[in-house]
UniProtKB/Swiss-Prot annotation:
This is CD166 antigen. It comes from Homo sapiens (Human). CDD domains: Ig. Residues 28-120, 125-234 form the Ig-like V-type domain. Cell adhesion molecule that mediates both heterotypic cell-cell contacts via its interaction with CD6, as well as homotypic cell-cell contacts. Promotes T-cell activation and proliferation via its interactions with CD6. Contributes to the formation and maturation of the immunological synapse via its interactions with CD6. Mediates homotypic interactions with cells that express ALCAM. Acts as a ligand for the LILRB4 receptor, enhancing LILRB4-mediated inhibition of T cell proliferation. Required for normal hematopoietic stem cell engraftment in the bone marrow.
Amino acid sequence: MESKGASSCRLLFCLLISATVFRPGLGWYTVNSAYGDTIIIPCRLDVPQNLMFGKWKYEKPDGSPVFIAFRSSTKKSVQYDDVPEYKDRLNLSENYTLSISNARISDEKRFVCMLVTEDNVFEAPTIVKVFKQPSKPEIVSKALFLETEQLKKLGDCISEDSYPDGNITWYRNGKVLHPLEGAVVIIFKKEMDPVTQLYTMTSTLEYKTTKADIQMPFTCSVTYYGPSGQKTIHSEQAVFDIYYPTEQVTIQVLPPKNAIKEGDNITLKCLGNGNPPPEEFLFYLPGQPEGIRSSNTYTLTDVRRNATGDYKCSLIDKKSMIASTAITVHYLDLSLNPSGEVTRQIGDALPVSCTISASRNATVVWMKDNIRLRSSPSFSSLHYQDAGNYVCETALQEVEGLKKRESLTLIVEGKPQIKMTKKTDPSGLSKTIICHVEGFPKPAIQWTITGSGSVINQTEESPYINGRYYSKIIISPEENVTLTCTAENQLERTVNSLNVSAISIPEHDEADEISDENREKVNDQAKLIVGIVVGLLLAALVAGVVYWLYMKKSKTASKHVNKDLGNMEENKKLEENNHKTEA
């Protein structure tokens, strides 16, 4: 006869076996966990009062059970089965909640909580799902450049270590790129690591670019599922250099065209609007049908006025794409006749001409001894004051640095001319004798007393201005003397004498020579007097005309009055005659 304990064990074994076959209990329940986190699986059963123990198992793909944890309700002890993949990873709490640390992809199973009583086994299955967030997508193997109208690989978008696998999407300027035949080709593939069971997703984009893609950002994203639902991670932006052919050629001139003058260096610069820009061009010079092959610049040195004309440049492989510009080489010629050092005699005529030839209207300025003249000089009869340094200067205002100047150094020579004057001092105690000399080069003056031949050294001289100066002596002669003034320069020696009476004998004084400065003042005064006289004559003429008109009107009015008075007298006489006849 069997014991009561043996009977209980056989009953428990039968119940466990039947539980593995019939699986009574609650419906499906899912626990989501992130990769590497701790999986917490609650036992979704109410603990019965006659509970003997609780147990956890998972099911293999073929449905066979694998027990992993046991907890007795009476002994309060916990036992973990010898399952290598869960060694040191399990924890079973008092309420029979199972915790699995360091979640792995292999933990995606159907776990079952089992509560066993003496007469029954209760089960609650739970599905465990493990999710792994993929790495941030990255665009790799990027093209160095994209060419318009050519389908070319733009790059690969890669996202690694995902579970489950995700999807990759490409964007242009934030808008989704969809496959388009001949323009957008997207190739997607995924690979699973056999050890970690994590996925790597790769999407290759082939793209036909246009100029509209210049500076446009391209990105990609990975969409995946996590414990809390669907999420998306975006890559960094990638901007590509877009190559496109040249559609227009332009030509530039350095320095600016309006400032080119003879002697300058001209640099022609040809530009194409393609990317990359053309590095070589053909340059066409005026009158030359064949182009000169060069880089994007061509330099002409020391240009002359005959370089004026149309300059062109074109693409080497497409000569019809051409640009042109007109260049004017500005020039300025100045001819002064005569020029340099010129010597003429006083009274001579000297025509002077300053001829200008320029690419534009030029301004002409005359200077004499660094003082600007109001008009160009003209000499019909040279004077000493005409001597000096003359400069004819011209410039093109629009062209910086284009100016010319020629100079004329005029020397006016003349033989010495002498005029002597004398004047008695108002006190009557001395006489002033002046020798006025005119000539160039400056004559030397010497005073002597005729007869004795004595030389007078005590003299006073004025400054030498415009070929004139004077020498003055003051004497008190006790008897009549004759003074001689000698003036000499490289041209001639001139002598003049003057008789001077003794101081006791009164005589007529001669007027002093008028200096150039005083002469100008006299001329100005004469002009003023003439102006005043002319003004008075005009005023008198106007007054005479007004008076004549007034008198003419007065006479006409008088005639009308006399006529009226005569008529009145005649009428009066007629009336008297009529009265006499009636009587």
